UniProtKB/Swiss-Prot annotation:
There is a cross-link at K689, K730, K808 (Glycyl lysine isopeptide (Lys-Gly) (interchain with G-Cter in SUMO2)). It comes from the Eukaryota. Component of a Polycomb group (PcG) multiprotein PRC1-like complex, a complex class required to maintain the transcriptionally repressive state of many genes, including Hox genes, throughout development. PcG PRC1 complex acts via chromatin remodeling and modification of histones; it mediates monoubiquitination of histone H2A 'Lys-119', rendering chromatin heritably changed in its expressibility. Residues 256-266 have a biased composition (Basic and acidic residues). Residues 224-255, 360-373 have a biased composition (Polar residues). InterPro entries: PcG_chromatin_remod_factors, SAM, SAM/pointed_sf, Znf_FCS, Znf_FCS_sf. Residues 917-981 form the SAM domain. Residues 1-28, 321-340, 381-395, 667-686 have a biased composition (Low complexity). GO terms for molecular function: DNA binding; zinc ion binding. Transmembrane segments: none annotated. It comes from Mus musculus. Ubiquitous expression. The gene is Phc3. This is Polyhomeotic-like protein 3. The modification Phosphoserine is found at S231, S261, S269, S312, S614, S759, S760.
């Protein structure tokens, strides 16, 4: 078993890495075209990338190195197996040479020569289509040197060839390649993880993981899948795909037709495996026809591939086809590994599918590995299938293909993946059945797969219908595939229906191991989970088995979650009517059961055996197939069930039902680690459009002038959140209502008036209300003006007035009150001040006057200042003026007291109003002013009485009396003070 898995792993690694049948044919042969294809810049890029890869700075690099060692071992085994299969792949070699020349090949070590050629082929496909990076990735994964060179190429090329290693290459791919082929990158990442897990041995796992990564990437281009069949075949197929997708598809189908007979005949021989590989590469149809032991699986993958091309536009179709093929190839390599360990969850799928074709386990496995890789590995390996499902998801992302078909294709690869687990049991039990299925695949790919695989059969059938026409007439079908033709083919093939029983028989065996992780995390269709879960578990088991590969896988897995977003990409596919290809005999059952079964998938209640067929088909077709063609959908659904990833892809195709199956697809592909993530992302897909939502999360990584820019999972919000905008608005009415309810005194009219009076104040109040919502209930405030009761949040900052109008009115009323009190007080103040001047001695009187008048004067000054606010204008008097005036009056009185002992006469006059003063009173007043004794006589000479004194100005004094400006100003100031008093 171990030797078989390892050989199978190596084969799968070779297939996935070269996948160009270079390994199958001869690494040297592939290398030559690659070298010829490679340009100086490419070589330099490879060197640079290799240097970067061999750097141990990151754990990813260490994992890559481990993966490289494992891959080299796998390549050695693969090379031996592929050489044995050289005869079968000889047909493709011519094509491979052409493809190598067309595609930019890259020199690499002999073991990685095939890988290199595939990378060159993948490059060609990249040039022709965005998926090329996937091919490069697959090849780079095949061998450490190849992966290093591929990685370098991808680095230099940018998004075209982003492959460093299973983990590193994926990371780089994401960073650099996602820009150009986001879906491809994701698919590659996803496939990487499944491959590792599916590989029975660590080295095999790492190789498988790398192969799967490469396969995913190459699948994106489709070149990889073709090249995987055989170095020549894959090259030819890749070329055809790259050159013209429609033509490529036709060529692939033709090649597969050529090879199918030998392959089916050689069910247990390397030649058969290589042919199966060739078939896979040549075209999905051919895979269905050619594979004898795992031909059902391969045919299924082929069918899927063809479905994609058929439904999708010819160019895009070929691209998708390549992607699907590569995905399936990735899955198949895993299957090859699993065959020996069909019972174990990790490997059970791999050995059986491979052995189904070739009884000899060790011999067949290596061979199968390469064919498996060459043709989509979905059927070949259950773990790989899980990964393949992921890859399928990636493939499905290319929506250019007919919406339903492309999803169907994606699902089919996954279905193939899961079918392989089922097939592993079924194949082991009856390899002849598989061979017969392979033959049937030739006649009817759909039937072939079903007979070969209980569950896979239905997925195969799905593909078969889509690709059946292609299988029958590979060239024509691929060139001019029609979903209806595929549909008829599917329906015509009775095996699909029969397959469910087989599936029920074999899936349960596989399902038990798989369900544990896949089913639980996947909650997808039980059948899909049974196979898909088995794949997932296989991947997990393989990871456990392979420490280095596991580490690598883990890295990819961690990176993979974004690839699982690829499942979302599948949503792009949803338009592709792959579902019609899915046309399944189970159609009737599936259509009716589709909603329920897809729900079952989500519930994980689905029964693995018979339900698998219908539930899988249901889930897959539910969203996509239902829309396009229920029969096909159901068949596709079965594949989807088989591989959760596929179902996810399907769900993108058929938004309506795809959502339910989609989550399962994602989970198996992601494996346990990513399964939870996939579930989260895929659950939304249970509803038709959610898968599209999954696509959006794809993280696009751009490398611009050396800067790696990753796009966020979500766009930055352009407008403010509706929550932010609406909440304050809701709060305000709430606050206002609370205030109105709590404040009974304040009627609504008053509230409205208040707001009208000062809108800014109300805004402030509202803001304060929001800020002090907690305080509102604690205390109530009373307005000092209107007496209204209210919460503090509705009062002004001072918390004294409820509104600004109340504050203003309060100020006006206060100023009026002050003015009235001041006017009422003034006569008393003055009389008091004058009366207090009656001391017996002149000095004592002055002293008394100051002491008495100051306390009274200051308050009056304050009142005057307050009166400035009064609407009525009044003369402004400053404190200094009043003090100076009082001083003058005091001095004048002192003088008069001195001159006139009888001041009793003057005092009454001084106490009277200035307007009634006589000339003598004015003289006495002026004489009392400081420094004005000399001018007092002038006033008398001018006969200025009290009234004239009040009318005097500085000019009068200066002109009429020739007074200096200083004394004139002082006198005028005193006169003004008299006026004010």
């Amino acid at each position: 078993m171990d030797s078989e898995p390892s050989s199978g792993t190596s084969v799968s690694t070779t297939a996935s890495s070269t996948t160009t049948t270079t390994i199958t044919t001869s690494s040297s042969r592939m290398q030559q075209p690659q070298i010829s294809v490679y340009s100086g810049s490419d070589r330099h890029a490879v060197q640079v990338i290799q240097q970067a890869l061999h750097r141990p700075p990151s754990s990813a690099a260490q994992y890559l190195q481990q993966m490289y060692a494992a891959q080299q071992q796998h390549l050695m085994l693969h090379t031996a197996a592929l050489q044995q299969q050289h005869l079968s792949s000889s047909q493709l070699q011519s094509l491979a040479a052409v493809q190598a020349s067309l595609s930019s090949g890259r020199p690499s070590t002999s073991p990685t020569g095939s890988v290199t050629q595939q990378s060159s082929m993948s490059q060609t496909s990249i040039l022709s289509a965005s998926p090329a990076p996937a091919q490069l990735m697959n090849r780079s994964q095949t061998s450490s040197s190849t992966s290093g060179s591929i990685t370098q190429q991808t680095m230099l090329l940018g998004s075209t060839s982003p492959t460093l290693t299973a983990s590193q290459a994926q990371m780089y791919l994401r960073a650099q390649m996602l820009i150009f082929t986001p879906a491809t990158t994701v698919a590659a990442v996803q496939s990487d993880i499944p491959v590792v897990s599916s590989s029975p041995s660590p080295s095999c796992q790492s190789a498988a993981a790398q192969v799967q990564n490469l396969t995913l990437r190459s699948q994106k281009l489709g070149v990889l899948s073709s090249s995987q069949n055989g170095s020549p075949k894959s090259a030819g197929q890749t070329q055809s795909l790259t050159i013209c997708h429609n033509k490529t598809t036709v060529t692939s189908s033709k090649i597969s037709q050529r090879d199918p007979s030998p392959e089916s005949k050689k069910g247990g021989s390397p030649g058969l495996e290589s042919r199966s590989t060739a078939v896979t590469r040549t075209s999905s149809i051919h895979q269905l026809i050619a594979p004898a032991s795992y031909s059902p699986i391969q045919p299924h993958s082929l069918i899927k591939h063809q479905q994609i091309p058929l439904h999708s536009p010819p160019p895009k179709v070929s691209h998708h086809q390549l992607l699907l093929q590569q995905q399936q190839q990735q899955i198949q390599p895993i299957t090859l590994q699993s065959p020996s360990q069909d019972p174990p969850p990790s490997q059970h799928c791999i050995p059986l599918p491979n052995h189904g074709l070739s009884p000899a386990p060790s011999n067949a496995q290596p061979q199968h590995c390469s064919p498996v890789q060459s043709h989509p590995p979905p059927l070949t390996v259950s773990p790989n299938q899980a990964q393949s499902a992921q890859q399928s998801v990636v493939v499905s992302p290319p929506p250019p293909h007919s919406p339903s078909q492309s999803p169907t294709i994606i699902i089919h690869p996954q279905a193939l993946i899961q079918p392989h687990p089922l097939v592993s049991s079924a194949l082991q039990t009856g390899p002849n059945l598989q061979q017969a299925a392979a033959d049937q695949v030739q006649s009817t790919a759909q039937l072939n797969l079903p007979s070969h695989l209980p569950l896979p059969a239905s997925p195969v059938v799905h593909i078969g219908p889509v690709q059946q026409s292609a299988l029958v007439s590979p060239g024509q079908q691929m060139v001019s595939p029609t979903s209806h033709q595929q549909y008829s083919a599917l329906q015509s093939s009775p095996i699909p229906i029969a397959t469910p029983p087989q599936m029920s028989a074999s899936p349960p065996a596989q399902l038990p191991p798989l369900p544990l992780q896949s089913m639980q995390s996947l909650q997808v269709q039980p059948e899909i989970l049974s196979q898909g879960q088995v794949l997932v578990q296989n991947a997990l088991v393989s990871e456990e088995e392979l420490p280095a590969a596991e580490a690598l896988v883990q890295l990819p897995f961690q990176t993979l979650p974004p690839p699982q977003t690829v499942a979302v990409n599948l949503q792009v596919q949803p338009p592709a009517p792959v579902d019609p290809p899915v046309v399944y005999q189970v159609e009737d059952v599936c259509e009716e059961e589709m909603p329920e079964e897809s729900d079952e998938c989500a519930r994980m209640d689905r029964t693995p055996p018979p339900p698998t067929l219908s539930p899988a088909a249901v889930t897959v077709g539910r969203g996509e197939d239902l829309t396009s063609e229920h029969p096909l959908l159901e068949q596709v659904e079965l594949p989807a069930v088989a591989s959760v990833s596929a179902s996810v892809i399907k769900s993108p195709s058929d938004p309506t039902h795809a959502s339910a199956p989609a989550p399962p697809l994602l989970i198996p592909a992601a494996s346990t680690r990513s399964s939870s993530t996939s579930l989260a992302s895929s659950t939304p897909s249970l509803e038709n459009k959610p898968p599209q939502a999954i696509v959006k999360p794809q993280i696009l990584t751009h490398v611009i002038e050396g800067f790696v820019i990753q796009e966020g999972l979500e766009p930055f919000p352009v407008s403010r959140s509706s929550l932010l905008i609406e909440q304050p608005v809701k709060k305000r009415p709430l606050l206002d209502n609370q205030v109105v309810n709590s404040v009974c005194v304040q009627p609504e009219l008053q509230n409205n008036t208040k707001h009208a009076d000062n809108s800014s104040d109300t805004e402030i109040e509202d803001m304060m209300a929001e800020e002090t919502l907690e305080e509102m209930d604690s205390e109530l405030l009373k307005c000092e003006f209107c007496g209204k009761m209210g919460y503090p949040n509705e009062f002004l900052r001072s918390k004294r007035f409820c509104t600004m109008s109340c504050a203003k009115r309060y100020n006006v009323s206060c100023s009026k009150k002050f003015a009235l009190s001041r006017w009422n007080r003034k006569p008393d103040n003055q009389s008091l001040g004058h009366r207090g001047r009656r001391p017996s001695g002149p000095e004592g009187a002055a002293r008394e006057h100051i002491l008495r008048q100051l306390p009274i004067t200051y308050p009056s000054a304050e009142e005057d200042v307050a009166s400035h606010e009064d609407p009525v204008p009044s003369a402004m008097t400053t404190r200094l003026r009043r003090q100076s005036e009082r001083e003058r009056e005091r001095e004048l009185r002192d003088v008069r007291i001195r001159k006139m002992p009888e001041n009793s006469d003057l005092l009454p006059v001084a106490q009277t109003e200035p307007s009634i003063w006589t000339v003598d009173d004015v003289w006495a007043f002026i004489h009392s002013l400081p420094g004005c004794q000399d001018v007092a006589d002038e006033f008398r000479a001018q006969e200025i009485d009290g009234q004239a004194l009040l009318l005097l100005k500085e000019d009068h004094l200066m002109s009429a009396m020739n007074m200096k400006l200083g004394p004139a100003l002082k006198i005028c100031a005193r006169i003004n003070s008299l006026k004010d008093s």
